[in-house]
């Protein structure tokens, strides 16, 4: 019983506190005419989209009786290196796609490429162990967690740091199946109905954007950062 409770708590942390990740679906990322300046005209508000995947054979979705086969593996998009708003968008898309891929495969490798400071990796280790120990898997949805950006552009909060508010939710059919017969829906991990509000915190380090998440209620806005949000300067 203690093991189950521990895993349940870990999933709650991983999926809820770890931003309740976003959706891994088709991309709308488009190139800027000038990569040295931010795209201040385009609105990025809305459903997050991503399409940078590695072909790994025929994808067979998971069911209650078997885990997924060959789920599409996200690869870091080149735009993640662009010091622009578009670069931040690409990094967030990769973070979310990597988290959903982890839920379906137990493979944490892509996630490490965007969480280079290991801010959220420890929250995801329960999923790695679930697959590694052959004690269970996720089924019911190709994107267990989805979300959308609720702001047109990110807000600058430091010399090399930005934050971007998102609204996230669990897929109602996403279910953790344990090999001993128990099942746990992602929705049951929720502390209440509705969506979750989070911030993605982005920082440009060593030529690439790194991403972590932070509950919106724990983040406060300063006058200087609010003033800079209307025109993102990267």
Task: Pin down the residues of each PLM region.
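Juxtamembrane and targeting peptides
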Residues: 26-90
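A short, amphipathic edge element
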Residues: 135-154
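Hydrophobic helical h-region of N-terminal Sec-dependent signal peptides
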Residues: 15-19
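N-terminal export leaders
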Residues: 10-11
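Actinobacteria-biased recognition of intrinsically disordered, low-complexity terminal regions
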Residues: 1-5
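Core segments of small alpha/beta cavity-forming domains
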Residues: 63-140
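Exposed beta-sheet edge and beta->alpha loop/turn motif
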Residues: 29-51, 153-234
């Amino acid at each position: 019983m203690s093991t189950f409770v521990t895993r349940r708590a870990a999933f709650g942390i991983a999926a809820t506190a770890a931003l309740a990740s976003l959706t891994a679906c088709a991309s709308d990322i488009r190139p800027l005419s000038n990569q040295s300046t931010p795209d201040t005209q385009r609105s990025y508000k809305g459903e997050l989209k991503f399409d940078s995947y590695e072909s790994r054979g025929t994808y067979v979705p998971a069911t209650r009786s078997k885990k997924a086969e060959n789920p599409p593996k996200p690869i870091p998009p080149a735009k993640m290196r662009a010091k622009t708003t578009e670069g931040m968008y690409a990094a967030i898309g990769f973070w979310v796609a990597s988290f959903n891929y982890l839920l379906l495969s137990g493979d944490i490798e892509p996630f490490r490429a965007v969480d280079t400071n290991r801010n959220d990796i420890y929250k995801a280790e329960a999923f790695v162990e679930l697959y590694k120990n052959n004690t269970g898997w996720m089924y019911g949805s190709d994107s267990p967690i989805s979300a959308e950006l609720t702001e047109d552009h990110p807000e600058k909060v430091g010399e090399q740091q930005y934050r971007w508010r998102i609204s996230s939710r669990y897929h109602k059919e996403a279910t953790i199946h344990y090999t001993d017969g128990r099942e746990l829906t992602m929705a049951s991990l929720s502390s209440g109905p509705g969506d979750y509000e989070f911030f993605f915190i982005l920082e440009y380090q060593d030529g690439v954007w790194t991403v972590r998440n932070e509950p919106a209620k724990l983040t406060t806005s300063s006058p200087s950062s609010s003033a800079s949000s209307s025109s993102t300067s990267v």
